[in-house]
Design a protein with these regions (language model features):
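Intrinsically disordered, low-complexity coil segments
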Residues: 65, 111-112
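Charged mid-protein connector segments
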Residues: 112-113, 137
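Extended, Lys/Arg-enriched charged tracts that mediate electrostatic binding to polyanionic substrates
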Residues: 114-126
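Helix-start/capping segments and mature chain N-termini
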Residues: 1-105, 131-190
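Non-catalytic nucleic-acid-binding/docking modules located in mid-to-C-terminal regions
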Residues: 108
Length: 190
């Protein structure tokens, strides 16, 4: 891999990990090399946006050790997003274990220290219940996959000064502005 030429895009790695929620309980972790999923054409995620995702990175340090950046924080936010979308709640431990396992099994894709590249992890969860009408999904799939990536902005970014107001919130109460769901991003294409 030419680490210096990587952009922010998907590159196949060896495995991804999955948990299935059916019949009121989570499955054991499944490790697979399959990049595809099979689901019903009326799955709730396809029609009603019952989908969420996270994004975090693994880095190799100057000492050669691999470090995950804020994995527990991402796991808690994933749970918060799942709760908001009425999806089954994975434990923080499940999400952390999935992230650790996908990094461990794809260690060859972690860029060397100093390249500016990283291993990007994408936990994604969605309702898989077949049906019509907006209602909570009874079934779900949680996947964690990864990809080596370069900088999101290849040309870099210019820092700016901002004021942060922790007393005000622009997100609508009980809306989706403070959770990480795909629908929040679709409008950016307009």
């Amino acid at each position: 891999i030419d680490w210096s030429a990587l952009g922010f895009d998907y590159h196949k790695t060896d495995v991804n990990v999955r948990y299935y929620f059916t019949d009121g309980k989570w499955s054991d972790m499944e490790v697979t090399s399959d990049e595809y999923i099979k689901m019903h054409m009326s799955a709730s995620c396809l029609h009603y946006g019952i989908e969420l995702f996270e994004g975090l990175k693994a880095f190799r340090g100057v000492d050669g050790k691999v470090r995950l950046f804020r994995v527990e924080d991402n796991a808690r936010r994933l749970r918060s997003s799942a709760e908001r979308l009425c999806l089954p709640l994975p434990t923080v431990e499940m999400v952390v274990n999935a992230c650790v396992e996908v990094v461990r099994r794809n260690e060859a894709y972690i860029p060397p220290y100093g390249t500016g590249a990283s291993l990007y992890l994408r936990p994604v969860m969605f309702g898989t219940t077949a049906g019509l009408g907006v209602k909570p999904a009874k079934d779900a799939l949680l996947i964690v996959y990864c990809s080596p990536v370069g900088a999101y902005f290849k040309q870099g970014i210019k820092p700016i000064l901002v004021a942060i107001d922790r007393e005000q919130d622009r997100a609508a109460p009980r809306g989706t502005g403070d959770v990480k769901v795909g629908g929040n991003y679709a409008a950016s294409l307009l």
